[in-house]
């Protein structure tokens, strides 16, 4: 879905920065509950047009409890405590990722599992992932006026059941290019069948907890059952709550299940032609939740359906990825992208994200010259700076302040604002390294800065993970001039490596970067992506000049240590998520335990069917 500028089923086989970065923020207004579901009317799978002959794998057959009328594995064995939590999203790192959504669904679930919860993540199978096994379970799902067959693939890693929905609309489009073409053939261009693709995801996700017999977890056996919390993520999963209320709960299925809806980026909403609503196969009572009118002419002019709007209204709880972003979303049309009034009614809770501290660890990083921790950072970062200067082809001198920019080259991240500020910095004794890929116009823009200032600026416009790690270790300041930033990961990675950030004062950057302690704030930049505001250029340049003057001083060294002495892991955010989800009151839910995550390279992660 291009960013905004301002079932039926048949189954067969305001200060800048806050001290407590992990504390959630709830913004509740009038307690609006959305549309009320119909009262459950008893029934079973047959009234859903569901017939079952799901075939278990040989390993599953050895451990299945027989005797269930509906499914051979319907009995849930739980020797652990906690909740049954099912995350659903279009991305799941490291298997698929274009941004923060993939990182969250890759990192938060293992932290939840470490606390004793049974956790599943469901996402499309965009590639032939070598560690995902065919469960031999298939489902025929109705989309529009036809049935489409999907298969369920599975792997169990880091305490989490990873489930992949296999269908040609996912695999054929993206195969081999997972990071580039999940949503469309080119940046900003959508596949025409995205509604069908993600309707399949939503409906298949509702079947998975009931029919997949998963026995890898030493504490849980069998299916997840029906007492689950679904955590939907962004517009691609907007209809899931409606399908739950339309297809299951009136038939006595998932009576106690609840849905939390998490907004990762309000700019992508899933807006489609109003005439497409019947293709969702939902009753008329849900039409108003999707109904939307805006002033844009894409995909059609005037009246539309809006998947994110429906996800917000039909969910039992609405969340987003940082407290300050939650405040911005309800502040007005510009930052709420015309859904601000809806969120003021439903209320919204902000929980800041964590990061993968095992992948980004300067004490063990194989890509950097000198490994270090908070006690050795100052000298080690100087050595890494020299290595970075040599790698980039810049004059090697550890005394020259080095500013870095790493990010997707699109309007949100402000590469055009950064480029416009570079000439204002050239009178300073400074070096600048730019790394990113994205829209061609921005790639050309950054390369033009290198051509104009060859002795001071280097631009690398291709994916280069080793260089990204070396930049984090060698840069003195990380520039993050985002027009808006729901949470942001880049600043967490920078601070993990002891690199203070000079950032715009928006979203999660406000919650995670503290002025004068772990970084420098530029103030809020304009969200108008069509122009580069001169006032924004001045803010970026002035803040970077201020940061340059601090580099090399005792105050700067204290900032480096402050950055590295933080706990930026998922541990705190996972506990906050637990508290919110427990509040939904799903039957059998209980608080978790204090546990440690399974390491990525642990023997428990060996793939097995």
Curated annotation (Swiss-Prot):
CDD domains registered for this protein in UniProt: GT5_Glycogen_synthase_DULL1-like
HAMAP family: Glycogen_synth
Entry's Gene Ontology molecular function annotations: ADP binding; alpha-1,4-glucan glucosyltransferase (UDP-glucose donor) activity; IgE binding
Catalytic activity annotation: an NDP-alpha-D-glucose + [(1->4)-alpha-D-glucosyl](n) = [(1->4)-alpha-D-glucosyl](n+1) + a ribonucleoside 5'-diphosphate + H(+)
Protein name in the entry: Granule-bound starch synthase 1, chloroplastic/amyloplastic
Transit peptide: 1-77
Subcellular location: Plastid, Chloroplast; Plastid, Amyloplast
Xref: InterPro entries: Glyco_trans_1 (IPR001296), GS/SS (IPR011835), Starch_synth_cat_dom (IPR013534)
Gene Ontology, cellular component aspect: amyloplast; chloroplast
UniProt region (Disordered), positions on chain: 29-67
Keyword Transmembrane in annotation: no
Alphabetical GO biological process terms: starch biosynthetic process; starch metabolic process
Organism: Oryza glaberrima (African rice)
Biased composition (Polar residues): 46-66
Enzyme class: transferase
Keywords associated with the record: Amyloplast, Chloroplast, Glycosyltransferase, Plastid, Starch biosynthesis, Transferase, Transit peptide
